[in-house]
Amino acid sequence: MNSETISAQAPATLTIASRESRLAMWQAEHVRDALRKLYPACDVKILGMTTRGDQILDRTLSKVGGKGLFVKELENALADGRADLAVHSLKDVPMALPDGFALTAIMEREDPRDAFVSNDYASLDALPAGAVVGTSSLRREAMLRARYPHLDVLPLRGNLDTRLAKLDRGDYAAIILAAAGLKRLGLEARIRTLIDVEDSPPAAGQGALGIEIATHRTDVAAWLAPLHDPRTALAVEAERMVSRALGGSCEVPLAAHAVWRAGELYLTGRVSTTDGQRVLTAEECGAVMTVADALALGRAVSDELEAQGALDIVNALLAASQAGKGDA
């Protein structure tokens, strides 16, 4: 289908729902610019929104409702027609979407790795005993506690600029962030070291952008189809299956990372206790041609982790999280 045919079928307007942080708006603008290139006659607008996840900054996500806090308001805008599509960092999207919504396009992935950011130290290995390291995720916290038990790991909330400001004012000796966000905002110079995926497998979907729509909007799905990257989509389908099968959420240090090598998809899954004392890892690979293949690969990795006792870790962490919420 040529661009003239696509443009002729495009709507007069499209509205993108997005969080209002600088990174989220960059992502929405990235999608807007791609849509404008595809459909020059279409007026593409951005509806900026503040989500509960952006408002609650004094507690970790695992204690206040998880990743859904970042998407609920955007889904409401899709449901009531204020927006036609919503753009997300895929790692922030819950593994199971509410009925009536779907991730219809997954864009080509940025760097999925975690980044070490510090003003005074070149790497995690250079940090002295007792140095304070900030992170927003239990997955990264578990990695730090397992590999660097001499460090003091503390929660770090807020958008990307807020986190960097907290580092710059001396609250932390170093912080761990997703490399993709820093690169997208032109802040790659802040990265002192990129952490190898063997040491710190990323969260499912990290580095990828997902576009969500209401499932009845088949017209929007068709317009978004040219933005979809099939290889990235198959990789993140496998990753998200690992997390979904194990009940993964913000309460569980769970990583899932897939990479293409010589035509096959290699998938690694990892589940840890929050103190890093127990770390379970599983790896599988296969020829993945369809979504069903990707889901099967994800299930194979989750089955292997279950055989190692992953559900014992997951259930204990979920029970502890629920008990903590009850005490709040």
Swiss-Prot record:
Modified residues (S-(dipyrrolylmethanemethyl)cysteine): C250
EC code: 2.5.1.61
Pathway note: Porphyrin-containing compound metabolism; protoporphyrin-IX biosynthesis; coproporphyrinogen-III from 5-aminolevulinate: step 2/4
Cofactor: dipyrromethane
PROSITE patterns tied to this protein: PORPHOBILINOGEN_DEAM
CC terms in the record's Gene Ontology section: cytoplasm
Keywords: Porphyrin biosynthesis, Transferase
Superkingdom per UniProt: Bacteria
GO function terms (MF aspect): hydroxymethylbilane synthase activity
Family annotation (NCBIfam families): hemC
Family under the similarity heading: Belongs to the HMBS family.
The protein's assembly and partners: Monomer.
Job of this protein: Tetrapolymerization of the monopyrrole PBG into the hydroxymethylbilane pre-uroporphyrinogen in several discrete steps.
Protein's name in the database: Porphobilinogen deaminase
Annotated source species: Burkholderia ambifaria (strain ATCC BAA-244 / DSM 16087 / CCUG 44356 / LMG 19182 / AMMD) (Burkholderia cepacia (strain AMMD))
